[in-house]
Amino acid sequence: MAKTVVLVVAAGRGRRFGGDLPKQYHDLAGRMVLRHTLAAFATNPEIGAVRAVIHPDDRQLYDMAAAGLNLLEPVHGGATRQDSVRLGLDSLKDLNPDKVLIHDGARPFIDHGTIGRVIRALDRHPGALPVVPVADTLKRGQDGFVADTVDRANLFRAQTPQGFRYAEIVAAHHAVIGNELTDDAAVAEKAGLAVELVNGAEDNVKITTGADLERARCLFDGPGEVRSASGYDVHRFDPAKDACWLCGVPVPHEAGLLGHSDADVGLHALTDAVLGAISAGDIGHHFPPTDARWKGAASDQFLAHAGSLVTAKGGRIVNVDVTIICERPKVGPHRAAMAARVAEILGISQDRVSVKATTTEGLGFTGRKEGIAAQAMASVWLPR
């Protein structure tokens, strides 16, 4: 049983945002908004499982946003957010978690500190709500004029994730079917559940309009630094195989590559580059060739792991570049597919991925067609 499960609500159409593309699937610093949100929970060690609630028409977009993350199968939402949450909660019945956190898919800046405060509050009370105090002076208007000033003491802006003991919030949601309530804390209030206020975070903003998205992009461009690192790998040919795995794509050839895993020289070099950019060792440290678990393993999981470590540090991948060095096979016909696959594994847009090929003009082991080499570069943005 997963003790704490997260339900990410991402079934909305974003009518206030405008346009045909729902806001949660817009680009934010090279990744979809929803990707940032899902990754924040999927990489948190306090979370046992993550499930998204999506619109039936958005499955292809969702799969792009969720690629490479360890998530539960998504479920479809309903006509309203409240309906979507209830359907999502019901889908967790077999997991029967102790606690559930309900989060807006369009809040990509959720931090581990807020998540932890919500989880710990549920040890004390059946509900927990992250909030930030209202700082602006509040005015009540009437007929276009100021009627009076509202006392802002004890007034807060509610955020998500809103946390609850699972059994109690499920019962509360079923008890208010037909009532239109603004958030899950209101559902809990209606059921008489005590909801503790915990400190939220000013940056944990919800993207509702196009202007919100622009402000979110400014947040991503805030204090931080870009780090770059390189990676290099070599594998000899194995005549017992009839294809080479290169950057996640099988390339037909008279020989494959010899290695403990699938010997994907491109992904191995790139994994080392990403790990190097965050000073996290090398591929052999995380996936030692002496470990039988990685015998014949697909190398996409190595790169996905490196990407998840970047996310866990609050960072993002800016761009990656791979150069494959060989006489044969020809890389050109497969280059676009390789770039697309790398982008999918890392959850970044394809215009942040470069895959190139060159030869050594007949010199050295690659010139003698004994194997393939690859070198890679990765640039990563990390908060200060």
UniProtKB/Swiss-Prot annotation:
Function: Bifunctional enzyme that catalyzes the formation of 4-diphosphocytidyl-2-C-methyl-D-erythritol from CTP and 2-C-methyl-D-erythritol 4-phosphate (MEP) (IspD), and catalyzes the conversion of 4-diphosphocytidyl-2-C-methyl-D-erythritol 2-phosphate (CDP-ME2P) to 2-C-methyl-D-erythritol 2,4-cyclodiphosphate (ME-CPP) with a corresponding release of cytidine 5-monophosphate (CMP) (IspF).
Residue sites binding a divalent metal cation per the record: D233, H235, H268
Source organism (scientific name): Paramagnetospirillum magneticum (strain ATCC 700264 / AMB-1)
Catalytic activity: 2-C-methyl-D-erythritol 4-phosphate + CTP + H(+) = 4-CDP-2-C-methyl-D-erythritol + diphosphate; 4-CDP-2-C-methyl-D-erythritol 2-phosphate = 2-C-methyl-D-erythritol 2,4-cyclic diphosphate + CMP
Top-level taxon of the source organism: Bacteria
GO BP term (any one): terpenoid biosynthetic process
Keyword Lipid biosynthesis attributed: no
Feature type site, description Positions MEP for the nucleophilic attack: R152, K206
Pathway(s) where this gene product acts: Isoprenoid biosynthesis; isopentenyl diphosphate biosynthesis via DXP pathway; isopentenyl diphosphate from 1-deoxy-D-xylulose 5-phosphate: step 2/6; Isoprenoid biosynthesis; isopentenyl diphosphate biosynthesis via DXP pathway; isopentenyl diphosphate from 1-deoxy-D-xylulose 5-phosphate: step 4/6
Site residues (Transition state stabilizer), renumbered to this chain: R16, K23, H260, T359
Family: In the N-terminal section; belongs to the IspD/TarI cytidylyltransferase family. IspD subfamily. In the C-terminal section; belongs to the IspF family.
Ligand binding (4-CDP-2-C-methyl-D-erythritol 2-phosphate): D233, V234, H235, H260, S261, D282, I283, G284, T358, T359, T360, E361, F365, R368
Name by which UniProt lists this protein: Bifunctional enzyme IspD/IspF
Required cofactor names: a divalent metal cation
